[in-house]
């Protein structure tokens, strides 16, 4: 009897979130984003925590912070992917770099250059590189003084795009 009641409560909660998510400022929209997030597997603990913090920022209307944290999760994912072959392809594509660790990569090269390197090693194509550079631009607008004040919808869209990009990059072998 209790199991049945709990099942009905969970079904009610899911249905309520689906119906409320159509309203522009409804917190239920974050729950829908959680569904996208659950599709991702293979994230590091750090990436997972960064994305969770990003969602918490949305819940607390800290939209610029949410942009920054979700980008940070994506670039960490990219750095880890570049490191997956011990930087062999990266050092071949960028012979002057001589990267030996993720820390070395972070300390010596910009995120813009890292995204360009993803194209050079065959992880992404030119149009995908432009998309990632666009995400970086949004992150920079959020992190530095600017007239960029994202709202709830823009932030959820950005995080959704980041999650979709991670999911896409997870499927890529390069």
Placement of each model-derived feature along the sequence:
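Charge-enriched, short contiguous segments at helix-coil
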Residues: 1-11, 121-174
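Amphipathic alpha-helical interface elements
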Residues: 11, 22-123, 127-130, 134, ...
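Residue-level detector of alpha-helical secondary structure
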Residues: 6, 10-13, 17, 37
